[in-house]
Structures are given as C-alpha cells and as structure tokens.
Design a protein with these regions (language model features):
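Bacterial N-terminal signal peptides that target proteins for export
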Residues: 57-65
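Bacterial N-terminal signal peptides
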Residues: 66-74
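N-terminal helix-rich structural modules
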Residues: 21, 80-287, 714
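C-terminal, non-catalytic "cap/extension" segments appended to globular domains
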Residues: 83-106, 118, 299-301, 431-433, ...
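Short pre-active-site segment immediately N-terminal to the catalytic Zn-binding motif
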Residues: 534-552
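Active-site-proximal, well-structured secondary-structure segments within enzyme catalytic domains
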Residues: 214, 218, 250, 257, ...
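Short His/Asp/Glu-rich catalytic/ion-coordination signatures at enzyme active sites or charged loops
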Residues: 96-111, 160-179, 201-243, 303-343, ...
C-alpha cells in the first residue's frame, strides 16, 4: 500500500515568508515546530503507496504513486505561513504540536474546503510571481522558488487526502468532489504556463552542465516533468491535454466514490449463526459487529474486501454461502445501475490512450513506462512471459491436486469452483501439514506484531527506537502515534498507524505522509500506515492472520523509505521514486517477518508463551504451500492492466464489451483460469482506475524480484547485522530519487541486473 508520482507543479514561496521560515529553521522537533507534510498530486496526486493487498496510494485523484514520479510535499505547519493574518482555520495557521503534527483536535470537516481554496489562491500568486519575474532566470530564483512554492497547499491537502481515504464521511466526500476540479485546473494552469516553462528551460539550457548532485537532479526532474506534461506541445494539443486531464480527474473522483459505495453495498447478509459454521468465535463476532455497523438487516454480515478472493472463504463450511460471497465480490461493480464502474473504465482508457498519442507515443503504456526502470512495454512483456512460462505448468498441477483432494470427501464428480479453492486448499494444508490458521492466529496479537515484530526488526537492522506519543491527536480513536529516534536517541520522525477497518475507510492498505523529509526545509518526516484489519470486540485483543502480519511488515517497509530519507529536496526524498522501484523496500521488509529471531520475538500468545517449535516449523513450511495462486492472481491482474494500456484510442471496447475484452486478453497470454482469477477484475481494479498504477501493476512483481535479490544479499552479509542495515540505508533507503536506482541496487547486491530466478526460488517454484 505504497500509497506510490507526478510532482506537485506548484509551490508557494513569497519573500515575506522567508523571515517566518528562518524563525523556525533551528527547531527542536520534540517540542516545537515540525517538518513538512506530504501530499499527493497529479494535481494533487496523492502520494500514497498501496500494499498489493490494497487498492494503494494516488494521483490527482487517488493516485498513489504515479507515472511521473516525484511526490509533492509540504513544509511543516510551523514553517508554513497562514493564508491570512487573522484566520482561525486550524489548517491555515502553524501547528504548535511536536513536529508540526496535524492538530486533529481542532480540525473540523468544515475547515477543509475553505482552507484548500485559500491555499490554491496563495499558490497561484506564488507561481505567477515566478513566471512574471523580470530577473534573468537562475537555479535559485526559478528552480528553488518553484520547489518551495505550494507549501501551504501541500500541507492542507496532505491532511485532507489522508482523511478522505481513511475516514470518508459524506461531508468529506462532498469536499473532495468540490475541490478536485479546482486542483486539476491549478495543475493544468501550471503545466501549461509558458512563461514559467520558458524560465525553467532557460535554467536547464544554461546551468544544467554546471550543477552537481541533488541540484542537478532537481533541475532535471522539474524540466522533464514539464515536458512530459506537454509544455512543448502546440497550443491546440495543450488545450486538448488540459481537457483530458480535467475529465480524468472527474472520472477518478467518481470512480473512488462509486467503488467504495459498491463494495459497501456488496455485503452478504446472513440470517443464522449456523450458516457461519466453520468460522471461529472471533470471526462470527466480527460478522455480528459488521452487521450492526451497517444497519442490521440481518443478524450477521460478511463484508467484502477489495480483492477478488475473500479470506473468509478459507473456513466457511456452507458452500452456497461461499458462492454468494465470491459472486458478491466479483460482481460488486460490473452490473447495471449506479454501481457499474465499466462506463468509467472505458472512457478513462480512451482518454489515457489519446493523451499518450498526443504526447507522441503509440499508446498509454509506452508513454507511462518511459520514466520507469522497465522503460518500455516490450521489456515488461519479456519479464512477464518468462514468469508465465515457469508458472503455468505448476499452476495446473496445483489446481488438479486441490480438486483431487476435494473429491476424496465430495465424490468423484465434484467440480472445484473458484469459491471452493481457499476452503479445500486450507483443509489440504491441515491434512498434509497438520496446521490450521486457528492454531497460529492466537500468536499474532496485533500489538505484539507491531511492537515486538515490526519495530523490533527496525531496531535490530537500523538501530531505530519507538516511543508512543499519546499526547498527539489523531483523526480517529483507533490510531496510534510513535516518535522514532535513531541509535543515538535523536528524534528523526513521527509514525502514525491506523490499522482497523471501518465503513468510512476504503479497502486495502497503504502508506503516505503528512510531511516528507527535506534538509533544505529543515524538515523531518511524519509518516503513516493505514490497513483494514478486523477489530475484536471492545476489551478483547485483536489478532492477525499470517497474510496480515506480512501486510503490516510490507507497509512499514514503505514507512522506512520515508523515515530514513536523507535528501536535500523534498521533491526527491523518500518514496519519490519510480513505481517499479518504490515497492522494493516494502516487499523486502516482509522478509523480516519470518526470520527466526524476529518471529520468536513477536509470536507470543495471551499467556505469554512463544509459538512451539513444532508449530512454528509447520507454519514456516506452509508459507510456500501451493504458491501458484498468489503468483497467478498477480500475473493475471498485471496482464489485464497492460492489455488496457496497450490499446490505441480507436480500439477501446465499449462498457458492454469490457468483460469480454478482459477475458480474451488473459486467454492470449495463457492466464484465463477460473480457478486463479485476477487479484482484481477490471471493474474494481482501483490501482489502475482510481490510482496511479495504469500500465504499472507489473511493478509489484518487478520489485519483488529486486526485493528477493536484496533479501538474498542480506542473508549473505548477515540479515540482522547493523552493518548490513546501515549499508542498505546509506546506499538505497536514504537516497530517495537522488541517485541512479539501478546503480544503487548493483552497488549493494553486486549484481549488474536483477535476477528473476530469485523470485521463483523464494516462492518455492
């Protein structure tokens, strides 16, 4: 959930406020003013990194991390001037909290829209001042001024979009609908501001060769960002791109709202406890709680999560109920009426294809991939085809084995259906390994996993320490806040965790930030993770499945990428890297969950007992039990994404043809398999249609290869050695996008190119 991007083309910098900034330039983060806050943008691309379990992170819209890649950020509250000297809006005045943390005790839903509009107005003024300047353009008066503009808007929007994703009430949704067109217009106005671009180009032409290090990188990213956004196009083409950007923004906002409503509406109501046979008492209690929170149309409710398959099917004995749950998931938003998202899909696909063509590319995929490590669609397909070749025969064997096992109890004519797979796979695992989820789950208390697992691993590897800050307010009572310090005790960041699901939170898991690290701004990071774990009834401890344990480690890997950043400029810091690199730190961090010394430290039951060695051995053996499903669902989703992005604008199917197109596309690559469907079907593929992963979902597999190579290098050098962690931190995690990422990868691993065999080996294939 790498929340993971286009940069904020806007930043506010008025000379009058330089004095204010200086007043706070030497702050003590423990007591006063803070670092900045990150936002999201494409206009405002939300800088959110999604977990594969999510639906991530955000672009003008909700794009997590987008094609253009640099994420925007904002200065800390204390460093950010208010829009007016007399305002009482808490979003427009400096925070007095540690690190400049958002003061959620004072912020009301009604504050967001006026604050956003005031910040937009201020940003326009700052950009116009740069564009209309009569001074000869220089790195300082143009590039740094541009980098420093928009701090107020970044601050306000980062807070708003966090709440918009995690606690979307009707009033918040209305604010999003009202503000997105204004943000899109602002982004377009900046992208196509000819005077501004001429100044940027002048600096690029006259100073690029003279600059070094991060200064040179910053200039290059800003200049190329303008070019990729259409600054060199004719006036007619600029106008059309502007129209496309506006329409896509509207469609993504509509998509997000509609999909959340569709998913909430897809709840499966259950009339009796007997129908829930097979579920644990805790799961049944959760179904009862979910029913009460959704109007209690029946005593129990099964809530649909964002992915195609639903984890609850693993233990649900009632086959007809399993079918109902699966069909509710698959068809949540592909029917007729208000929840059908396919008309949005086809319109957005056509607009993206047209934009790619206007920019001079054959399709949107070619345009989108140019700024990534993969670079071209051909390279992506070569990568995918090699994986499919190894995967396909193993997948067929895996499915046949599960069906054969089911027929032992159900009879020789039993036909395995997709809603049966998790159920019989789990029974087969228990029979072969004598292991069930119910045996291991009591050892994964959510607090222990976080403190004794996730935090402990970061302490062992990077020397980090964590102290809960109960004095800092949050936007929801379920959240926790931690101050992060290094091995010397020096505070370096704040970390917020929001782990439990609720009706107002969209599905999935992600990372983003209220503030990104920047030495130029004397700014420390304020990072957050959001997940959707089930919460136990009040007064009882909550427990995680193994998949959820790895999700927590995954999202904290993104968080570490932000926490350990050590860059000059906020545009280049932290997770502001191509999306096919940004998922590497998160996927790599998952590997610590199963390292014995870490595992033994957090896998403890309510009696304080560690997981028995025999049970632990079986659980570790089960991690790669039947590995094809997880790989196959990702391959299928990736190929569906690429199929849409490869189409020219003249070949986009209609809404009624969309499902057939998806099936035919999967059939062409050997992935049309009812037993292993895509992780997300098109109609609810939020990464692609609501986020920034169009032509980019391959990034999860691509970065898994990088992560597996990194993990093997750690194993060789000493997985828990501080020297290994410090080297990884210095060469990769702290560097943001200030270095050549392939060179950084090679420097740490000693490999000239990533070795894809590592992925197959780690998955047991």
């Amino acid at each position: 959930m790498p929340r993971k991007r286009k940069k904020t083309h806007v930043l506010i910098f008025l000379a009058f406020y330089q004095t204010i900034w200086k007043l706070f330039s030497n702050f003590d983060p423990r007591h006063a003013t803070p670092p900045a806050t990150n936002v999201t943008i494409v206009v405002i691309q939300r800088n959110i990194l999604y977990n594969n379990e999510s639906t991530m992170n955000t672009k003008i819209k909700k794009t997590l991390l987008t094609v253009g890649l640099s994420s925007s950020v904002m200065l800390s509250m204390a460093q950010t001037p208010s829009a007016t000297a007399t305002t009482t809006n808490p979003l427009l005045i400096p925070s007095t909290l540690s690190y400049g943390a958002p003061d959620f005790n004072r912020i009301k839903a009604s504050d967001y829209l006026p604050a956003l509009e005031a910040a937009i107005a201020q940003q326009r003024k700052a950009i116009n001042a740069i564009a209309e300047s009569k001074q000869t353009p220089t790195f300082r008066n143009t590039i740094l001024a541009y980098e420093n503009s928009g701090k107020l808007l970044d601050r306000v929007s980062s807070i708003f979009f966090c709440v918009d994703e995690a606690d979307k009430t009707p009033e918040i949704a209305a604010t999003e609908k009202a503000i997105m067109p204004q943000l899109t217009q602002l982004d377009n106005d900046i992208s196509f501001n000819e005077k501004l671009f001429h100044r940027v180009k002048y600096v690029y032409d006259h100073e690029f060769a003279k600059l070094k290090g991060e200064d040179r990188r910053l200039l290059e990213e800003i200049y190329k960002g303008f070019v990729r956004n259409g600054a060199l196009l004719s006036k007619e083409k600029k106008t059309r791109v502007e129209q496309i950007n506006k329409r896509i923004s509207d469609l993504q906002q509509q998509w997000g709202t509609q999909l959340q409503e569709a998913t909430n509406n897809a709840v499966v109501w259950v009339n009796s406890k007997e129908e829930l046979a097979g579920l644990s008492d805790a799961d049944i209690a959760q179904c009862e709680k979910d029913a009460q929170s959704r109007g209690a149309k029946a005593p129990y409710a099964i809530v649909i999560i964002n992915t195609t398959q639903q984890p609850i099917l693993t233990n649900l004995d009632n086959r007809d109920l399993r079918r109902r749950v699966y069909e509710a998931s698959v068809h949540r938003s592909d029917g007729t009426g208000r929840y059908n998202t396919l008309p949005i899909v086809v319109e957005m696909a056509k607009l993206r294809a047209e934009k790619g063509e206007i920019m001079g590319y054959h399709n949107y995929a070619a345009y989108s991939l140019e700024k990534t490590m993969a670079q071209t669609p051909e390279n992506v397909y070569t990568f995918l085809n090699n994986l499919i070749k190894a995967y396909r025969p193993n997948a067929d064997k895996e499915t046949a084995a599960i069906e054969a096992y089911a027929r032992q109890t159900m009879g020789p004519d039993f036909q395995l259906q997709p809603y049966d797979r998790f159920y019989y796979s789990a029974k087969m695992k228990k029979a072969q390994l004598n292991l069930s989820e119910d045996e291991v789950k009591p050892y994964f208390n959510i607090d222990s996993v976080q403190v004794n697992g996730v935090f402990y691993a970061a302490h062992r590897v990077y020397g980090l320490n964590f102290k809960e800050r109960k004095d800092l307010p949050t936007y929801h009572a379920d959240m926790k806040v931690f101050e992060v310090s290094d091995s010397t005790g020096k505070p370096i960041a704040l970390f917020y965790s929001d782990y439990f699901r609720r009706p107002t939170k969209r599905g999935g898991a992600w990372m983003s930030s209220f503030a990104k690290q920047s030495k130029a701004w004397n700014q420390l990071p304020i990072i957050y993770n959001v997940c959707n774990f089930a919460q136990a009834p009040e007064g009882q401890p909550s427990y995680l499945t193994w998949d959820e344990v790895t999700t927590m480690f995954h999202e904290f890997g993104h968080a570490l990428h932000g926490i350990l950043s050590n860059c000059q400029y906020n545009t280049l810091s932290g997770t502001a890297v191509p999306r096919d690199f940004v998922e590497m730190p998160s996927q790599f961090n998952e590997s610590f969950a199963s390292i014995p010394e870490i595992f033994n430290h957090y896998a403890i039951n309510s009696r304080g007992e560690h997981m028995p060695e025999a049970l632990k051995a079986k659980m570790m053996e089960s991690i790669n039990f039947q590995p094809c499903y997880a790989l196959g669902e990702n391959l299928a989703a990736t190929c569906a994404d690429m199929a849409w992005a490869m189409l020219p604008s003249s070949a986009i199917p209609t809404a009624t043809q969309a499902t057939t197109f998806e099936q035919e596309s999967l059939k062409k690559v050997g992935l049309l398999d009812s037993q292993i469907p895509p992780r997300y079907f098109t109609s609810y593929f939020n990464h692609v249609w609501g986020g920034g992963y169009a032509a980019g979902y391959y990034s999860y597999l691509w970065t898994e290869v990088l992560a597996d190579n990194i993990a093997m290098t750690f194993k060789q050098k000493g997985a828990l050695k501080r020297t290994t962690g410090d080297e990884f931190r210095d060469k990769i995690l702290s560097r943001g996008y200030t270095v050549d990422l392939m060179k950084a990868f090679s420097s740490f691993t000693g490999l000239q190119q990533p070795d894809a065999q590592a992925l197959l080996k780690m998955r047991g294939l």
